[in-house]
UniProtKB/Swiss-Prot annotation:
Protein role: Pigment protein.
InterPro entries given in the database record: GFP, GFP-related
Chain residue numbers at which the record places covalent cross-link 2-iminomethyl-5-imidazolinone (Met-Gly): 63-65
Official protein name in the record: Red fluorescent protein eqFP611
Keyword match tRNA processing: no
Pfam families: GFP
Keywords carried by this UniProt record: Chromophore, Luminescence, Photoprotein
Modified residues annotated as (E)-2,3-didehydrotyrosine in this record: 64
Use in biotechnology or industry: Fluorescent proteins have become a useful and ubiquitous tool for making chimeric proteins, where they function as a fluorescent protein tag. Typically they tolerate N- and C-terminal fusion to a broad variety of proteins. They have been expressed in most known cell types and are used as a noninvasive fluorescent marker in living cells and organisms. They enable a wide range of applications where they have functioned as a cell lineage tracer, reporter of gene expression, or as a measure of protein-protein interactions.
Subunit structure: Monomer.
Extra remark: The emission does not change over the pH range of 4 to 10. Maturation occurs via a green intermediate and is complete within 12 hours. Recombinant expression at high temperatures induces oligomerization.
């Protein structure tokens, strides 16, 4: 347990960027229990609102990127909590099946006992008649991220699905590289493992100008038994 990371932690976030050339800025604040893997965040669009695209494509960059709030089961070293007080960064490319591409660069730091996130995002090639630009998405299904050590950090892959108005899904693939600001020689790296995520929107108002969302995340090994004794 990292003494700098308490059982209840506050967080603040600033996100700015563009989607299909449209500029915007969001801020958020929240709290949660990093050791239970639960967190709640309240997010406001402070520039460029109401957004002309679905807020859902931003949602994963607020909390699916809030990696300090993951419960790690026994035997899995916590790459993210070990990274403090220096913190960590991550870069992600999300490719949607309709051709849209969403990239994120995020920095996580610890300031006066509060987790502070700065995110730069860029979305391109989202079809004007697609679910994202028509604002016809209805939230993310739960998913599992696969993680393993790579290039001195962690590499994450996952397939995700957005619910769409009228039934059906818009699927996408996530590829994320996580890097600690601390040299990896100073802490224990985890091996191959998974993280289950459930990201839910609890509240929204004013045409998605204000959103409250909650996430529960747990790191684990495969639940299936191995004949070779592997985890």
């Amino acid at each position: 347990m990292n003494s700098l990371i308490k059982e209840n932690m506050r967080m603040m976030v600033v996100m700015e960027g563009s989607v299909n050339g449209y500029q915007f800025k969001c801020t958020g604040e929240g709290d949660g229990n990093p050791y239970m893997g639960t967190q709640t965040m309240r997010i406001k669009v402070v520039e460029g609102g109401p957004l002309p695209f679905a807020f859902d494509i931003l949602a994963t960059s607020f909390m699916y990127g809030s990696k300090t709030f993951i419960k790690h089961t026994k035997g899995i070293p916590d790459f993210f909590k070990q990274s403090f007080p220096e913190g960590f960064t991550w870069e992600r490319v999300t490719r949607y099946e309709d051709g849209g591409v969403f990239t994120v660069m995020q920095d996580t730091s610890l300031e006066d006992g509060c987790l502070v996130y700065h995110a730069k995002v860029t979305g391109v090639n989202f079809p004007s008649n697609g679910a994202v630009m028509q604002k016809k998405t209805k939230g993310w299904e739960p998913n599992t991220e696969m993680l393993y050590p790579a290039d001195g950090g962690l590499r994450g892959y996952s397939q995700m699905a957005l619910n769409v108005d009228g039934g059906g899904y818009l699927s996408c693939s996530f590829e994320t590289t996580y890097r600690s600001k601390k040299t990896v020689e100073n802490f224990k790296m985890p091996g191959f493992h998974f993280v289950d995520h459930r990201l839910e929107r609890l509240e929204e108002s004013d045409k998605e100008m204000f959103v409250v969302q909650h996430e529960h995340a747990v790191a684990k090994f495969c639940d299936l038994p191995s004949k070779l004794g592997r985890l």
